[in-house]
Regions:
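Conserved active-site tyrosine of GNAT-family acetyltransferases
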Residues: 123-125, 129, 256-261
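Conserved GNAT acetyl-CoA-binding A-motif
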Residues: 102-115, 241-250
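Amide-forming acyltransferase catalytic core, primarily the GNAT-like/NAT-type
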Residues: 29, 52, 127-213
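Conserved acetyl-CoA-binding loop-helix of GNAT-fold acetyltransferases
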Residues: 81, 87-100, 125-126, 226-239
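Charged, low-complexity intrinsically disordered regulatory/assembly segments
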Residues: 189-276
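Conserved beta-strand in the GNAT
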Residues: 50, 56-65, 73-75, 80, ...
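Active-site rim helix/loop that mediates acceptor-substrate recognition in acyltransferases
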Residues: 14, 18-21, 25-53, 57-65, ...
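Conserved catalytic-core motifs of GNAT/GCN5-like acyltransferases
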Residues: 111-113, 130-144, 263-275
Length: 276
């Protein structure tokens, strides 16, 4: 497309980014939240990407390098194109730009979670992405079961935990790094409290209230030797912090941890990837 430029964003692009996301959920369409969100992402080393035509921002994406226990990849957190410019190859060019960055950074693949409600999995298939692991989701009421092992409350989980331990719960985004950032490096104005426990064996559990429901928390959990009682430990922590429900997002391989609960486990998403 004539006049199209894909480039790294700056804080000065926030007004254009807001226009791209107008009418969508999330912080980018909000004039109060967009600037601190973009500033924090840039500070934390995300590749905040924009597409522009004749100096007008018409697309926005955010990528983050993730080096977890299974390898190194570049994760696409969000991508949005203005309605009037969709279907013109702009998204594909933004993806290709991200793939070039992934190669330059030594990442073995790029990964994302397509929004199945919008049919974006078809777009990624056309870009050469393959379907990976299934992500499932379940919400369970909190209860005072008691703890199955000794825990200590600490200020935060260290970033290096994503390289040392498997990411058991918390996959509302298929990147341990991105979810760690959301819970531990919040932008200015995000006053949600993250509670962190570490066990005697080095397992980490984090609870943080959801953006739109302060009585419901999502959980992040890292472990190399998952405790069969993890779920009850997490629900016990949730009850002690005043939450009514805990949201668990996880790869299907961990579904057995919920065999003692009657809540329906739902399909959430499919991890999608492309080797670089």
């Amino acid at each position: 497309m004539q006049g199209l430029l894909i480039r790294e964003a700056s804080i000065n692009d926030c007004e254009g980014i807001q226009s791209v996301h107008m009418g969508t959920p999330g912080p980018w369409a909000n004039a109060v939240e967009c600037v601190p969100w973009i500033r924090k992402r840039i500070e934390r080393g995300y590749y905040v990407q924009v597409a522009e035509i004749n100096a007008k921002v018409i697309g926005h994406a955010e990528w983050v390098e993730t080096h977890d226990i299974k390898g190194k990849f570049l994760y696409l957190c969000v991508m949005q194109i203005k309605d009037d410019y969709q279907g013109q190859g702009i998204g594909r060019k933004m993806v290709n730009d991200g793939i070039q960055l992934a190669r330059a950074q030594g990442c073995e693949k790029v990964v994302t979670i397509p929004d199945e409600d919008t049919g974006s999995e078809k777009f990624y298939a056309k870009c050469g992405f393959s379907k990976g692991r299934q992500i499932k989701s379940v919400s369970i009421p909190t209860a005072a079961y008691g703890y199955s092992q000794n825990y200590k409350e600490v200020d935060s989980a260290p970033l290096e935990i994503i390289r040392k331990c498997h990411f058991i719960f918390g996959l509302s985004q298929a990147s341990a790094r991105h979810m760690w950032e959301i819970n531990n490096e919040k932008p200015l104005g995000d006053n949600r409290v993250t509670t962190t426990l570490i066990s005697d064996t080095g397992d980490y559990i984090q609870l943080c209230s959801q953006y739109n429901n302060p009585r419901k928390a999502w959980v992040l959990c890292w472990s190399n030797n998952p405790n069969p009682m993890f779920v009850k430990d997490i629900l016990t922590l949730g009850r002690s912090k005043g939450f009514q429900e805990i949201l668990f997002d996880f790869f299907a391989e961990y579904e057995a941890y919920f065999k003692d609960f009657t809540r329906e486990i739902k399909h959430y998403a499919i991890e999608t990837y492309k080797f670089t």
